[in-house]
């Protein structure tokens, strides 16, 4: 939008792209600059003026987008830990050294109910570890397991949730 020949406005000239070209004089400008452009094709400018805020004869000053300062988290070089606990990826091998734990051991360690290592050995062929179906010899009907529950071999497969519920203490 050009304001040519109007009283109180500077005659604005535009280049081949429609951008205002400064005249160098700057008479009659109020010096108002702000966000939001009207009639300009880019930058932070004002309506039909070529400068603003004391910049005489310069056009197109300022960036294309306003980006507010980003507030960053700074901890002053101190690492902050979350509240979650983690288990070690290795354990004592009984010979004075360390051995790497498998996924099964890590999962067992996370489950409530204490150490299940002794109970798995006591169950023998009647059941397996967590997530494994018990494969017996077929002669284990009516035997008592480590928890005092009696298992009967009905040939019916248990669901995963039933197996987990069976392993949890206090659910019998």
From Swiss-Prot:
The stretches annotated as Type B repeats are: 98-115, 156-172
Which keywords appear in this protein's UniProt record, sorted alphabetically?
A: Cytoplasm, Repeat, Stress response
Please report what switches on or represses expression of this protein: By abscisic acid (ABA) and water stress.
An annotated GO cellular component: cytosol
Where in the cell is the protein located?
Cytoplasm
Q: Which is an annotated Pfam family here?
A: Dehydrin
So which residues are the signal peptide here?
none
Show the InterPro entries listed in the entry: Dehydrin, Dehydrin_CS
The protein depicted here goes by the name Water stress-inducible protein Rab21
Q: Per the UniProt entry, what species is this protein from, by scientific name?
A: Oryza sativa subsp. indica
């Amino acid at each position: 939008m050009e304001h040519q020949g109007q009283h109180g406005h500077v005659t604005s000239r535009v280049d081949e792209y429609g951008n205002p070209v400064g005249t160098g004089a700057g008479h009659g400008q109020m010096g108002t600059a702000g966000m939001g452009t009207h009639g300009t094709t880019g930058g932070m400018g004002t309506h039909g003026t070529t400068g603003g805020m004391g910049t005489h004869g310069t056009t197109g000053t300022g960036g294309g987008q306003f980006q507010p300062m980003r507030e960053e988290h700074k901890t002053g070089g101190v690492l902050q830990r979350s509240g979650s606990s983690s288990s070690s990826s290795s354990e004592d091998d009984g010979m004075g050294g360390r051995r790497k734990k498998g996924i099964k051991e890590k999962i067992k360690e996370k489950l409530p109910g204490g150490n299940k290592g002794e109970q798995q050995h006591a169950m023998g062929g009647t059941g397996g570890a967590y997530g494994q179906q018990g494969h017996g010899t077929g002669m284990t009907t009516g035997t008592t397991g480590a928890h005092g529950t009696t298992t009967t071999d009905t040939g019916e497969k248990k669901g995963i949730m039933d197996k987990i519920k069976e392993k949890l203490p206090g659910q019998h």
